Amino acid sequence: MFPNNKMLLIAGPCVIEDNSVFETARRLKEIVAPYSSSVHWIFKSSYDKANRSSLQNYRGPGLKLGLQTLAKIKETFDVEILTDVHSPDEAREAAKVCDIIQVPAFLCRQTDLLVTAGETQAIVNIKKGQFLSPWEMQGPIDKVLSTGNNKIILTERGCSFGYNNLVSDMRSIEVLRRFGFPVIFDGTHSIQLPGALQSQSGGQTEFIPVLTRSAIAAGVHGLFIETHPNPASALSDAASMLSLKDLERLLPSWVQLFTYIQEMDTVSI
C-alpha cells in the first residue's frame, strides 16, 4: 500500500472549519517537502465530528460540502486523503473521493460499518477503541477481510485509564504489528483527557514529543497527527492538536529516529 522505507505521516486539522483548510494543507506540503524521500504524507480532516461532547459544539460542514472540499485539496495539492465515516452510507460516499476511509475508535466494532468500508475496496484505517485490548482487534480485522479487502491500517490511540484519562501502552504496538498490517500511532488523541473540560475534551500536548518518539522506537509505520495553525482558536480538539509550527520542529527528530529504527537489526525473544 505504501513505500516500506518511508514513515507515514497522516496529518491535517481535526475538522474542516472553513477555507483556511487549504492554507493548512499548503503549509503541510511545504513542511514535508524537504523530507519527501523519507516521509509519505497523507492529508486528513473530518467533514463531521459526530461524537462531540456537547450538542452545541461545532461539528463540521457536513458530508456533501466536506467531501467537495477534500476533493479540491486532493486535486490542488496532489495528496492522498483520509477522512472518518460514521455509517455505511457515509463510507460509500467517502470512498468515491478519499483514498483511505477511517473507522473511528468508538465505532471500531460496528459490523455493518466495517463490512461496508471493506466493500468499497478503499484502504481502511481502523482505530483501536479506547475500551479494547490490542489482541481484540482481530474481530474488526476479520470483518474487513471478509469482504476480500486486505488493505488495512491499524491505529493505536491510547486506552482508558480511570475517568477522563488515557494511557499509551507501547506493548500494544507490538501486538498490533503481529497482525501483519501497517500500524500507526495517534500522537494527538492519545494525549487527550476525554470530557475533562465537561463540554469538551482536554489535552496534554506537552507529552506529544515523548509519546511519538516512544511509538516510533516501538516500531510503528507512521504517525497520525492532528494539526492546526493556531490550536487555541480551533473549533474542535483545541486542547490536543499540535500547532503547525511545533509539527515542523518535531518532524526532523521523527524522521531521524524512524530511519535509525528501520536500519536496526530486530532481535526477538
From Swiss-Prot:
One of its GO terms (molecular function) is 3-deoxy-8-phosphooctulonate synthase activity. The lineage of its organism: Bacteria, Pseudomonadati, Chlamydiota, Chlamydiia, Chlamydiales. It is an enzyme of class 2 (transferase). The gene is kdsA. GO terms for cellular component: cytoplasm. Gene3D superfamilies: Aldolase class I. This is 2-dehydro-3-deoxyphosphooctonate aldolase. One of its GO terms (biological process) is keto-3-deoxy-D-manno-octulosonic acid biosynthetic process. InterPro entries: Aldolase_TIM, DAHP1/KDSA, KDO8P_synthase. Keywords: Cytoplasm, Lipopolysaccharide biosynthesis, Transferase. It comes from Chlamydia muridarum (strain MoPn / Nigg). Pfam families: DAHP_synth_1. NCBIfam families: KDO8P_synth, PRK05198.1. Pathway: Carbohydrate biosynthesis; 3-deoxy-D-manno-octulosonate biosynthesis; 3-deoxy-D-manno-octulosonate from D-ribulose 5-phosphate: step 2/3; Bacterial outer membrane biogenesis; lipopolysaccharide biosynthesis. Belongs to the KdsA family. The keyword Transcription regulation does not apply. Its EC number is 2.5.1.55. It is found in: Cytoplasm.
